[in-house]
Amino acid sequence: MQCALYDAGRCRSCQWITQPIPEQLSAKAADLKNLLADFPVEEWCAPVSGPEQGFRNKAKMVVSGSVEKPLLGMLHRDGTPEDLCDCPLYPASFAPVFAALKPFIARAGLTPYNVARKRGELKYILLTESQSDGGMMLRFVLRSDTKLAQLRKALPWLQEQLPQLKVITVNIQPVHMAIMEGETEIYLTEQQALAERFNDVPLWIRPQSFFQTNPAVASQLYATARDWVRQLPVKHMWDLFCGVGGFGLHCATPDMQLTGIEIAPEAIACAKQSAAELGLTRLQFQALDSTQFATAQGEVPELVLVNPPRRGIGKPLCDYLSTMAPRFIIYSSCNAQTMAKDIRELPGYRIERVQLFDMFPHTAHYEVLTLLVKQ
């Protein structure tokens, strides 16, 4: 991938960009094998990769510069702003949106937030695109609601320029910290969720629900999990840290009982909407802490699927699973280091199958799917 921003030394986010993709994949596979070196692995499946550029469905832009000449991108460590509208990780469909947003910021009088001076209103622009219909969700992250009326007044112009904007919100983030979003979300459109579709499974994206940023690889990850589950004698499963339900909705069959648990209510609302559309009545999604939910149960299903954040599932949940001993555990991880640590805490299990998914090209990060079987 050629990147003018990298070549000019203006952005170093893609640290592996100079390595060809096959080399990147080999290095990631070697890292994963090294992390799992203490465990016998029955089957290493071939790594899965996707496009090397234009693959991201989401842009998180720090807004800086002036209200007349805003910059959308990032701040360097010394506070110097960098415009990243030309980043080749974004699809071509993002360029016209960025181009229209800059004059809109001036029209609406949304003064960019100045970190050094702690002044200004507009902190971030968050843009998400649906692969299924090209619809977009746009979120303005503001310090307060001071400019809300001005923004509402100017909005029809932006909607006329960009009819693909299906969901538009304002998020209020009042704290002087590098936190992407606050708790308050104000909808400026009637539509509140973006429709997405992976492998004929309807998914929904709401403002405060996590969704994978590489749809081409994420859809293969979900399809692989579905294929693995279909090969197992499973009638009842848990989907812990389930997010918008991607794994559970792919794996469920009409006669399977499935419980999906996720702490974010917005994500659970998405999962319930998808389950209703699919007519899957034996699926239950609840907004709870996954560890607290699991450890309070007196019995476990045949399969527990976990998809935790980078920190892993942690010792309390590992201890519970070791004691309760479900027949199968599928572990989806965005941090193989913590996954390996967790597997060490599950001594009664052997690794049947491992597959690497290159969700984050040009970086050292990757996703991994592991099937653990009770010995």
Swiss-Prot record:
Described function: Catalyzes the formation of 5-methyl-uridine at position 747 (m5U747) in 23S rRNA.
Binding residues annotated for [4Fe-4S] cluster, in chain numbering: 3, 11, 14, 87
GO MF term list: 4 iron, 4 sulfur cluster binding; iron ion binding; rRNA (uridine-C5-)-methyltransferase activity
Annotated catalysed reactions: uridine(747) in 23S rRNA + S-adenosyl-L-methionine = 5-methyluridine(747) in 23S rRNA + S-adenosyl-L-homocysteine + H(+)
Entry's family note: Belongs to the class I-like SAM-binding methyltransferase superfamily. RNA M5U methyltransferase family. RlmC subfamily.
Catalytic site: 334
Signal peptide: none
EC code(s) of this entry: 2.1.1.189
GO BP field: rRNA base methylation
Keywords per UniProt: 4Fe-4S, Iron, Iron-sulfur, Metal-binding, Methyltransferase, rRNA processing, S-adenosyl-L-methionine, Transferase
Residue positions binding S-adenosyl-L-methionine: 212, 241, 262, 307
Organism, as annotated: Escherichia coli O81 (strain ED1a)
UniProt key word rRNA processing: yes
Alphabetical list of Pfam families matching this protein: tRNA_U5-meth_tr (PF05958)
Domain of life: Bacteria
Protein name, per record: 23S rRNA (uracil(747)-C(5))-methyltransferase RlmC
CDD domains (UniProt xref): AdoMet_MTases (cd02440)
